[in-house]
Amino acid sequence: LARRRLGASAEVLVRTSPCRMGMRSYMTWNEVPAAPLDPILGVNQKFQADTSAEKVNVSIGAYRTDEGKPMVLSCVKKAEALLLEQSDLNKEYLPQRGDATYVQLCQKMLFGEKSKLLASGVVATAQTLSGTGALRLGAEFMKKFAQGKTVYISNPTWGTHNSIMTQAGVPFSHYRYWNAAGRDLDLAGMLEDIEAAPEGSVIMLHAAAHNPTGVDPTTEQWGEIMAVCKAKKHVCWFDSAYQGFATGDLDIDATAMRAFADEGLPLFVSQSFAKNFGLYGERVGTFSITCDTPEAVKAVMSQLDIIIRNLYSNPPKHGADSVEAVLSPPLRAFADARSDPLFRRKHRQDR
C-alpha cells in the first residue's frame, strides 16, 4: 500500500538505500586517532589505575593532608561557611567579565593597594577559568587584535603554555632561560633572545616561582630584562600562577610585575588561585590588560566580553565568592595569620 501511494520513487529509494547496500552515509569517527595523554594529568590517570598499595601520587601540584588526602584550606572552609549564612545567597549567572568586587580585589592583589594604574582606571580585568582560561582568553584576544605578533615563551616552561598557543592559532617561539651547566638563570641568553625578537613582540614571563625550574631573576636581573623589553617596545605577559610561593609574601612575589607596570610597559597578566588558595577544581582566575586610558579599558572589556561569551559564556560563581570572602575583612586577617599556606611557608623560612 505504501509503495502504491509513493510511486516509483519509493522503489528507487529502497533499491539505492545505503543501509540496503551495506554502506553508511554518516560519519562514524573511526579514523580519529587517539590523542596522547597530557604530560601532567596523564601521570595522574596512571596513578589512579595503579593497584599498588605502596603508590605515591606526586604528579599534580596540589596540597594533601599527612594521609595523602585532598585538603581544603581553613580560610576557604570559613569563607564557604560564611557564604551559606548569607541571606542573599544565590546561584545566578555572572556577567561575562565576572563579579565586579572579586575582580577589584584580584587587581589589588596583583598590582597593589596603592597602584597608580588602578587609581587611574586603566586596567581591564575579566574573571576567567583559572590560569589556563586566562591564558586562552589572552591568546584569543591576540588573535583578533595582535595578528602576526609572536609570543616568546621561556625554555623550559609549563608545557601547556605552548599547547594553548597552538590550539588558539597564535604563533610562538622561545627564549633561553635555564643554564643547565650552572643550574641557574641564563640571563645573557635570555636578554639576547628577547632583544632579537621583532619590535612589539609579546614576551611571556613567570611572575614568581618559575615553572618548572623554580629559578627567578634577581631584582637587578629583572631590571635588565625590563630595560630590553622597554627598548624593543615589547608587550610583557606575566603569568602569575604561584603568587606567594617564591618568598611567602604576596607583595614581594608581585614586585617585578609591578615594576614593569610602574615603568609604563604594556602588560597582559594571567592570574590563578588554583595553587595559592587550593581551589584546583573551582577554576578561579583573572586576565588583565593595562591600557592608556579609561576609554580604552571600556573598549577592551567589551571585546573580552564577546570572546568570553563565545568561549564559555560566563565564569563560575562559587570559587570567586570564596576568594572574595577570603580577601575581604575579617577573613583576610585570619588567612594571613593562621591558615594561609603562604604564611606557613614563610614561617618555615623564618625558622
Ranges and model annotations:
Residues 77, 82-84, 88-231, 243-257, ...:
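Conserved core of the PLP fold type I
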Residues 26-98, 105-108, 316, 320:
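N-terminal "arm"/small-domain region of PLP-dependent enzymes with the aminotransferase-like
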